[in-house]
UniProtKB/Swiss-Prot annotation:
It holds the Pfam family SAICAR_synt. The keyword NAD does not apply. Its EC number is 6.3.2.6. It comes from Thermotoga petrophila (strain ATCC BAA-488 / DSM 13995 / JCM 10881 / RKU-1). Keywords: ATP-binding, Ligase, Nucleotide-binding, Purine biosynthesis. HAMAP family: SAICAR_synth. The keyword Transmembrane does not apply. GO terms for molecular function: ATP binding; phosphoribosylaminoimidazolesuccinocarboxamide synthase activity. One of its GO terms (biological process) is cobalamin biosynthetic process. This is Phosphoribosylaminoimidazole-succinocarboxamide synthase. It comes from the Bacteria. Pathway: Purine metabolism; IMP biosynthesis via de novo pathway; 5-amino-1-(5-phospho-D-ribosyl)imidazole-4-carboxamide from 5-amino-1-(5-phospho-D-ribosyl)imidazole-4-carboxylate: step 1/2.
Amino acid sequence: MNYEGKTKIVKVTDDYALLEFKDDITAGDGLKHDVLTGKGSICAETTAILMKYLSEKGIKTHLVEYIPPRTLKVIPLKMFPLEVVVRLKKAGSFVRRYGGVEGEDLPVPLVEFFIKDDERHDPMVCVDHLEILGIATREQAEKMKEAAVKATLALKEFFERANFELWDIKYEFGLDKDGNVVLGDEISPDTFRLRKKGEIFDKDVYRRDLGDPLKKYREVLELCRSLNSQ
């Protein structure tokens, strides 16, 4: 059984799934769209490196194996229709909603839940909404929150070794066959904000038309390769 989303194709078998990364890049709930040759392979390898790192930190991920150049072999998950965002600094939609200066530190990691729904612009919800709407139980939501914060702090530490700042990051979670909450989808410049001395190394380059996003994505991959080998 196959599924195709905006940036990935999922091929499901009995035991495993194959996540094939496309070269598409989107923004604004899919209203902005381009194809960048090579992006899929960059995001696939970046995801593989970072998920392997998180697994070593005790965080359950769906990664089984990276199959070059653009495919991940993963554990099949029943995905929650959610984006789980962890913010370390004020940026993006947080500033639009609440004000403040982009790049200001938040006192503690802030976790937000958004329903994946482009037509409704991914509405933000609380744990009570998740329960009432039948999306996730309170226990599942707490497990997602706990794993998301733990992963974010681990990745913050990873990038700080090269003096990069992780500002925020989006995760997606699902349930494995035993009902465990597991980190799925991807971890790449498509899903996090990464900065160094004011320079942008993430999808904001594309959102804001600030240059060649593929160049920045390649630099992030090279950074991950270098840090992973240390």
